[in-house]
């Protein structure tokens, strides 16, 4: 994986664009035209639409918005503009075939590389104040997000796992937990316990000197955080299973009012991809295969309501996003009674993610044990705060003080108020996208994404 370049290098950006597109194409290479339409579901897109939308977005922002070129496809906006096309109508569109979609995808990338490749980036800025590199990065990161969406769509639709070239070398310090290699004891290994965070005044958000930030991260602002204790690891399957076995899904006293309404409507009695086997053993569906539940893997595909209900049962709580970012980014003073002014870009420091620090980029083709990868610990000893599994926080997704939408106005503002913030990335997240201050957000009922959580003491 090519990290997001630190400088506005045409060659580096061109290489990142090509690598990102190659990954997108790998994710759908084995799928038929019919599989790339799939059933009409509220939580996924037809993949022929999704892949075409990725190319349309790149064309719109780089070629049309910045360069003021004419559309390649006259009907492109009516097919692929997510702001104009209601989600449930995307299956009814006259979508091109897979082959035609791939030809469009390649044509747009070729045009971008031809115009913005080795001969240099356009240094001038448009009326909105953003230069060409900004829009190339925007399109690239957008493609990274959709590559993750394509992967969880394959999980949702019971497709086989994608065949990813980078996954062929599975060393690099990672020790993947093979699907189905369960914790034979049936008991959790000793927990790493809680990290003590002294609290204090902390800068939440991103600073203007970063190469690229999304509008919802702007800008870093001082927040006061009280001392707290946070789990050093994400919650494991072994820790979540007793909540299920104790009837946690059948006790309305453990659920927020809207959470209980969701549980009754969904008929949820356990995580969405769990299934009870004869003899009381749990199985988990990993893409198209049912495997014995792996005790030390993080609990996956649980929504915010499920995480909140577990916390009530366990006498714990979810961290706020400020607490989460402090635990990931801050450094303790020598006496551990306060934090220093330093703020890390990643839990381990400012160096780009490596395979011995974070499970990202499909490298393990799944999650690893929650106590793996100690080289990626934060200054407070919190593990895997980047990669492996997205982590729900207690915080509603909303603007930071002084928020101003970026050119892509539909990215953040329409979702303020009814989504929850997740942090940290998961095993399919690209290394060029994720860092401590990146904010993801989903509606609290979403169980299809690779979402889990860690807890805080009350």
Pin down the residues of each PLM region.
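Functional-site microenvironments in short loops/helix caps that host divalent-cation chemistry
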Residues: 139, 143-145, 149, 155-169, ...
């Amino acid at each position: 994986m090519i990290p997001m370049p630190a400088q506005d290098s045409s060659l580096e950006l061109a290489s990142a664009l090509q690598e990102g597109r190659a990954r997108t194409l790998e994710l759908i290479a084995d799928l038929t035209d019919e599989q790339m339409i799939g059933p009409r579901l509220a939580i996924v897109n037809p993949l022929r639409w999704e892949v075409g939308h990725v190319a349309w977005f790149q064309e719109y922002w780089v070629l049309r918005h910045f360069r003021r070129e004419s559309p390649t496809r006259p009907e492109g906006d009516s097919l692929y503009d997510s702001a104009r096309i209601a989600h449930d109508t995307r299956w009814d569109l006259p979508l091109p075939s897979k082959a035609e979609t791939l030809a469009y995808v390649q044509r747009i990338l070729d045009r971008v590389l031809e115009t913005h490749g080795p001969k240099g980036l356009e240094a001038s800025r448009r009326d909105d104040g953003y230069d060409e590199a900004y829009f190339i990065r925007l399109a690239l990161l957008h493609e990274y997000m959709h590559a993750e969406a394509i992967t969880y769509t394959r999980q949702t639709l019971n497709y086989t796992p994608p065949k990813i070239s980078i996954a062929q070398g599975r060393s690099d310090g990672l020790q993947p937990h093979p699907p189905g290699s369960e914790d034979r004891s049936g008991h959790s290994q000793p927990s790493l316990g809680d990290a003590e965070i002294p609290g204090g005044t902390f800068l939440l958000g991103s600073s203007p000197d970063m190469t690229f930030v999304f509008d919802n991260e702007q800008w870093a602002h001082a927040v006061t955080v009280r001392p707290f204790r946070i789990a050093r690891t994400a919650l494991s399957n072994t820790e979540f299973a007793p909540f299920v076995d104790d009837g946690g899904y059948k006790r309305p006293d453990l659920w927020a009012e809207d959470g209980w309404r969701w549980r009754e409507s969904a008929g949820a009695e356990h995580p969405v991809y769990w299934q009870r086997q004869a003899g009381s053993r749990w199985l988990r569906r990993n893409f198209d295969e049912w495997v014995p539940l792996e005790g030390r893997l993080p609990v996956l595909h649980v929504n915010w309501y499920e995480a909140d209900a577990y916390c009530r049962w366990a006498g714990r709580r979810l961290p706020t996003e400020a607490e989460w970012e402090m635990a990931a980014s801050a450094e303790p003073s020598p006496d551990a009674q306060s934090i220093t002014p330093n703020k890390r870009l990643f839990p381990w420091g400012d160096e780009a993610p490596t395979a011995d620090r974070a499970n990202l980029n499909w490298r393990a083709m799944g999650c690893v044990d929650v106590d793996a990868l100690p080289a990626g610990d934060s200054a407070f000893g919190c593990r895997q705060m980047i990669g492996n599994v997205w982590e729900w926080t207690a915080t509603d997704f909303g603007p930071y003080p002084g928020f101003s939408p970026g050119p892509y106005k539909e990215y953040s503002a329409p979702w303020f108020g009814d989504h929850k913030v997740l942090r940290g990335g998961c095993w399919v997240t690209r290394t060029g996208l994720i860092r401590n201050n990146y904010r993801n957000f989903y509606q609290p009922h979403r169980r299809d994404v690779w979402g889990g959580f860690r807890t805080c003491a009350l």
